[in-house]
């Protein structure tokens, strides 16, 4: 995946320029369609270059309960022709409202660790005693076909993706208005016990300390306003 993202037309032109500098001063260069032509004295070199139009990776993260999933679903619906979602894998228990292969690929710990050993993930992380990861098979297919990819992942995974693909990733952090409001939202889900909710709040405080790594930080106070702000961010990045 990295080579496809890195080798754009500009990169190839730079490579050709480097080749020219190593040849005689009589060398000339022309770029015709996908063919780069070097003329070194009487020698003509034609490089047939396949230009791959790859998309961008939008990584959306934030504490559990902040509203990431709902926002991402609305973004995908709004940008039907421009944005694709990569379904993550996890070892956490499936919620009543979730569907296998739609919300997540649900794995047991042994299955997930086999995938880690097989280098099957773009990124993976342990969060609240469960594994989460983005499958390469999902992500690479979308990006290689020129699609823009949106990932809804934990902040550790977000930083891994940025490190691997620094020029192609846009990091967006969704922040709660306050920890008190986040607690209210977590309780409203009514699918976790009090200890789990408290653990999520502690984790949320740690995550909010990482916002300096993100290009955009959006506070989800009112859903419609937050969605409009995210739509504006993506439109600007598409262009």
Curated annotation (Swiss-Prot):
Keywords: ATP-binding, Cytoplasm, Kinase, Nucleotide-binding, Transferase. It comes from the Bacteria. The keyword Iron does not apply. It is an enzyme of class 2 (transferase). It catalyses: GMP + ATP = GDP + ADP. The keyword ATP-binding applies. ATP binds at residues 62-69. It is found in: Cytoplasm. SMART domains: GuKc. InterPro entries: GK/Ca_channel_bsu, Guanylate_kin-like_dom, Guanylate_kinase, Guanylate_kinase_CS, P-loop_NTPase. One of its GO terms (molecular function) is ATP binding. Pfam families: Guanylate_kin. PROSITE patterns: GUANYLATE_KINASE_1, GUANYLATE_KINASE_2. Its EC number is 2.7.4.8. Essential for recycling GMP and indirectly, cGMP. Belongs to the guanylate kinase family. This is Guanylate kinase. The gene is gmk.
């Amino acid at each position: 995946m990295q080579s496809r993202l890195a080798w754009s037309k500009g990169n190839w032109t730079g490579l050709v320029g480097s080749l020219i500098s190593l040849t005689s001063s009589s060398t000339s260069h022309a770029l015709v369609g996908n063919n780069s032509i070097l003329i070194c004295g009487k020698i003509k070199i034609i490089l047939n270059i396949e230009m791959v139009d790859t998309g961008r990776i939008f990584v959306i993260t934030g504490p559990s309960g902040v509203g990431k999933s709902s926002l991402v679903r609305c973004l995908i619906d709004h940008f039907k022709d421009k944005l694709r979602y990569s379904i993550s894998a996890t070892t956490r228990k499936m919620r009543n409202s979730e569907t296998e292969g739609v919300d997540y690929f649900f794995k047991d710990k042994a299955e997930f660790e086999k995938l880690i050993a097989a280098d099957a993930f773009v990124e993976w992380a342990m969060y609240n005693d469960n594994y989460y990861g983005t499958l390469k098979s999902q992500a690479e297919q979308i990006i290689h076909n020129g699609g823009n990819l949106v990932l809804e992942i934990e902040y550790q995974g977000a930083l891994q993706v940025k490190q691997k693909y620094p020029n192609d990733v846009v990091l967006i952090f969704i922040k709660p208005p306050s920890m008190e409001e986040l607690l209210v939202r977590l309780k409203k889900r009514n699918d976790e016990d009090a200890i789990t909710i408290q653990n999520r709040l502690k984790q949320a405080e740690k995550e909010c300390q990482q916002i300096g790594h993100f290009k955009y930080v959006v506070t989800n106070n009112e859903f419609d306003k937050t969605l409009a702000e995210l739509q504006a961010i993506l439109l600007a990045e598409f262009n």
